[in-house]
Amino acid sequence: MRVALIDYGSGNLRSAAKALERAARDGGVAAEIVVTRDVEGVLGADRVVLPGVGAFANCRRGLQGIDGMVEALAEVALVRARPFLGICVGMQLLADEGVEYGRHPGLGWIGGTVEAISPADPALKIPHMGWNSLDFQADSHALLAGIEPGTHVYFVHSYHFRPADPATRLASVEYGGPLTAMIGRENLVGTQFHPEKSQAAGLRLIANFLRWAP
């Protein structure tokens, strides 16, 4: 199995690659983890991981700046329906648009907008950074197998995904109000938290992704 980790200048590639490799090894999954910005490499992948750090618009431009990359990702994820995982801004890019430093189009694969976090408690600082506990909205999802509600995972973000369809929100986190922590439909899943930084729970989610057959 070939897993493409997309290199477009906006992701924690080293830590994400190491987490994917460890999850595969510990989980007994035969997986080749390939960090790539090559369109043909993406088209040949069995699974795709899209990381992302920084501003929404910069990440979108980074993807668009690789000739044919957005089209290749759409072919693999939407047409061939191969498992796709977006991490942090990689998840946010699945939305219709982001409003960080203006209005910018997302990939539009899961309806919704990416908006600034505005906690009800003014004492809460932005960005939302550190460990926080997950609340599950979905009855079950394959990527959450073996992970209990209330499990702590690691976040660093100032913007959040507000889904058009609440049913696509798989998990939330409380930070002066509920924020989307995990989103998904069909073969697409995104996490606002960083599984590669979330220790045992993060490795479990990644291993689940590597075994996932949506």
Curated annotation (Swiss-Prot):
Q: What subcellular locations does the record give?
A: Cytoplasm
Q: What is this protein called?
A: Imidazole glycerol phosphate synthase subunit HisH
- Domain Glutamine amidotransferase type-1: from-to ranges: 2-214
GO molecular function, a single term? glutaminase activity
> Active site annotated at which positions?
C88 (nucleophile), H194, E196
Which reaction is catalysed here?
5-[(5-phospho-1-deoxy-D-ribulos-1-ylimino)methylamino]-1-(5-phospho-beta-D-ribosyl)imidazole-4-carboxamide + L-glutamine = D-erythro-1-(imidazol-4-yl)glycerol 3-phosphate + 5-amino-1-(5-phospho-beta-D-ribosyl)imidazole-4-carboxamide + L-glutamate + H(+); L-glutamine + H2O = L-glutamate + NH4(+)
- Supply the alphabetized keyword list: Amino-acid biosynthesis, Cytoplasm, Glutamine amidotransferase, Histidine biosynthesis, Hydrolase, Lyase
For biological process, the GO terms are: L-histidine biosynthetic process
What Enzyme Commission number does this protein have? 4.3.2.10, 3.5.1.2
Main role?
Answer: IGPS catalyzes the conversion of PRFAR and glutamine to IGP, AICAR and glutamate. The HisH subunit catalyzes the hydrolysis of glutamine to glutamate and ammonia as part of the synthesis of IGP and AICAR. The resulting ammonia molecule is channeled to the active site of HisF.
Q: What does UniProt give as GO cellular component?
A: cytoplasm
Indicate the principal place this protein occupies in or around the cell: cytoplasm
Q: Give the source lineage, highest ranks first.
A: Bacteria, Pseudomonadati, Pseudomonadota, Alphaproteobacteria, Rhodospirillales
What binding partners and quaternary form does the record give?
Answer: Heterodimer of HisH and HisF.
Taxonomically, which superkingdom? Bacteria
